[in-house]
Curated annotation (Swiss-Prot):
It is an enzyme of class 3 (hydrolase). GO terms for cellular component: cytosol. GO terms for molecular function: magnesium ion binding; phosphoglycolate phosphatase activity. Catalyzes the dephosphorylation of 2-phosphoglycolate. Has phosphatase activity towards p-nitrophenylphosphate (in vitro). This is Phosphoglycolate phosphatase. Belongs to the archaeal SPP-like hydrolase family. It comes from Pyrococcus horikoshii (strain ATCC 700860 / DSM 12428 / JCM 9974 / NBRC 100139 / OT-3). Keywords: Carbohydrate metabolism, Hydrolase, Magnesium, Metal-binding. InterPro entries: HAD-like_sf, HAD_sf, PGPase.
Length: 231
């Protein structure tokens, strides 16, 4: 199937390790856009962050934020979940681990809880979820722990974003570097993992870049453009 759009993670995929945007990734994104291939930014960050990043980087596709819980396109926002059990979990975590911290972005979030991974282990979070019998999942993005409803993920976000573009998810190629990109891999037509990605993501990829971080993201975009006849 012909690839008509590229969805791509932000942190670690089009950035340096310190999260600064990588100029080579920026050039690759703009090259794809110039060829008529819309880029969809897909991130665990807030919808406000994703919208701003899209404007500054120069992408034309929808943005998928909050790990799939929020979609924004042409000044229209859709939230696919709300938080209830997440706060029950957080109250319990705070009782047991007083030093645990959520992201400073929590006041802007509506679809999931984000816990700083240096303050608690993701396996511990999962154990507490099971103890409390909550209908939640915890995913380590490599930058933070994202806690959300089971149906909220990058894959479901890409499915919804594809509707805005009038294409099928299988007509999207996805590029990522984290565990939370696995759900995206399940719905798209072509999958690329950046070199520093965890083993499980690489095992499920159609292509693994030779370079890491933003250089790897740039390599991924050019690879997709060449493979599907745009270059």
């Amino acid at each position: 199937m012909k690839i008509k759009a590229i969805s791509i993670d932000i942190d670690g995929t089009i950035t340096y390790p310190n999260r600064m945007i990588h100029e080579k990734a920026l050039e690759a994104i703009r090259r794809a856009e110039s060829l008529g291939i819309p880029i969809m930014l897909v991130t665990g960050n807030t919808v406000q962050f994703a919208e701003a990043a899209s404007i500054l980087i120069g992408t034309s596709g929808p943005v998928v934020a909050e790990d799939g819980g929020a979609i924004s396109y042409k000044k229209k926002r859709i939230f696919l979940a709300s938080m209830d059990e997440e706060w029950i979990l957080w109250n319990e975590i705070r009782k047991r681990f007083p030093n645990a911290r959520t992201s400073y972005t929590m006041p802007d979030r509506r679809a999931g809880l984000v816990i700083m991974r240096e303050t608690i282990n993701v396996e511990t979070v999962r154990e507490i979820i099971n103890e409390l019998n909550l209908n939640l999942v915890a995913v380590d993005s490599g930058f933070a722990i994202h806690v959300k409803k089971p149906w909220i993920n990058k894959g479901s976000g890409i499915e919804k974003a594809s509707e805005f573009l009038g294409i099928k998810p299988k007509e999207v190629a996805h590029v990522g570097d984290g565990e939370n990109d696995l759900d995206a891999f399940k719905v798209v037509g072509y999958k690329v993992a950046v070199a520093q990605a965890p083993k499980i993501l690489k095992e499920n990829a159609d292509y693994v870049t030779k370079k890491e971080y933003g250089e790897g993201g740039a390599e991924a975009i050019y690879h997709i453009l060449e493979k599907f006849g745009y270059l």
